[in-house]
Each structure stands twice: as structure tokens, then as C-alpha cells.
A protein has these predicted regions:
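Conserved acidic catalytic loop of the alpha/beta-hydrolase fold
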Residues: 1-9
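Short beta-strand immediately N-terminal to the catalytic nucleophile in serine-hydrolase-like folds
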Residues: 11-13, 38
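Gly/Ala-rich beta-loop-alpha elbow adjacent to hydrolase catalytic centers
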Residues: 13, 17, 21
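Flexible "cap/lid" loop of the alpha/beta hydrolase fold
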Residues: 23-26, 31-65
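Core-facing hydrophobic residues within beta-strands of well-ordered domains
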Residues: 32, 158-159
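Conserved alpha/beta-hydrolase catalytic His-Asp/Glu region
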Residues: 63-118
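Conserved serine/cysteine hydrolase catalytic core
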Residues: 95-155
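Catalytic histidine-centered segment of alpha/beta-hydrolase-like enzymes
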Residues: 164-175
Length: 187
């Protein structure tokens, strides 16, 4: 950010990106004028994350594109427009050596990633304007009560909670509302 920005900026982060944004704001408040956290994944239950990691490890790929698509549609991508979902599949689904398909990711890195989501809530410095969007269709929620309580206590009137009627893929399911939340924080 020192190289790319002329000064402090508003940082927007979705899911794990929200965790990164919170950590950056806590470590380098001089770089941040505000945060927009889109269903951030922070301080999640370790048992839940272990289950997710175990599921990924036991079944990291799909028979074909249709199966991968169905898994997305049946999960948190159900509200994402078809063209956006197809773009995701085109860009990130790759052929595996055994004739199956999988996501263009590192499975070992992803298994480690799930444990990162269990870390405690890093609260930005007092006075950091922060908007958190919580997706209400996610159960259990990624934006936990613990996270919201910590931010309310640490930021007071500088914290805004928005609860949206959608699943976890907030920026893709609600692009107009997401853009408005970002514009509001930039103002």
C-alpha cells in the first residue's frame, strides 16, 4: 500500500479478505481511513473449521464441470447470477490429471487457511470508520456475534452493522448494495 496509494485508503474485504483488512487496520492504522467488511470470516469455531477442512481433504475435486457448478449453486453461490457463476467456473476450474476437475487452488494451503479463520478478532484503532455487512442466510454466520460485539465495543459510533438478506457471497449476490456501502464509506 505504501507503493500504490498516495495516502490512507478505505479497505474493502470479503470473507478472509475481511480478516486481512482487520489485521491491517490493527497493525498499520496509518494506512487506513475506513473499512468495509463484507461478511468477514473472523474468530470462527475451530470445530466447524476442522469439519470444513476435513470435507475439503476427503473430496477436493469433481467428476465434471456440472458437478462443480451444482456444488456452488447448492451452497453459498445460490444467489449469484448465472453469468457470474460461469465466469468463476471458466476462470478457476481446471482439469486434473485423472480426468476430474478441481479449483485452481493449493489444497495444503487451503487446509491451513481454514485454521486462520479461527484467530481472535483484531480490533482496529478507536475512530476507524467501519461498516460490516452480515449475510443473514449463512448459518452459522461467518460474521460472528463475537466479532460484532468486539467491533461495537472497540469502535462505538464509528461502527455500522448492515444485515443483508443473502448468503455469504455478498459482493456477487448484492453488487448494487455493495457498491453503495463502499461509496458511503468513501464519502
Amino acid at each position: 500500500m505504501d507503493a500504490e496509494a498516495d495516502g490512507p485508503v478505505v479497505v474493502v474485504g470479503h470473507s478472509f479478505g475481511g480478516a486481512i483488512a482487520l489485521n491491517l487496520a490493527a497493525a498499520r492504522p496509518d494506512l487506513i481511513t475506513g473499512l468495509v467488511l463484507l461478511d468477514p470470516a473472523v474468530a470462527l469455531d475451530g470445530r466447524w473449521m476442522r469439519e470444513v477442512a476435513d470435507d475439503m481433504y476427503s473430496s477436493p475435486d469433481y467428476t465434471d464441470r456440472a458437478e462443480a457448478r451444482q456444488e456452488k449453486v447448492g451452497g453459498s453461490w445460490g444467489e449469484v447470477p448465472d453469468d457470474e457463476l460461469d465466469r468463476e467456473l471458466d476462470e478457476h476450474l481446471v482439469d486434473a490429471a485423472d480426468g476430474r476437475v478441481g479449483w485452481r487452488i493449493s489444497i495444503p494451503a487451503m487446509l491451513s487457511y481454514w485454521s486462520e479463520l479461527t484467530r481472535p478478532v483484531p480490533v482496529p484503532r478507536d475512530g476507524t470508520p467501519t461498516t460490516l455487512v452480515r449475510a443473514t442466510h449463512t448459518d452459522p454466520p461467518y460474521a460472528s456475534d463475537e466479532l460484532i460485539t468486539a467491533l461495537e465495543a472497540g469502535l462505538g459510533p464509528n461502527f455500522t452493522l448492515l444485515e443483508w438478506d443473502c448468503d455469504h457471497m455478498v459482493p456477487l449476490a448484492k453488487p448494487t448494495e455493495t457498491a453503495a456501502a463502499i461509496r458511503d464509506r468513501l464519502a
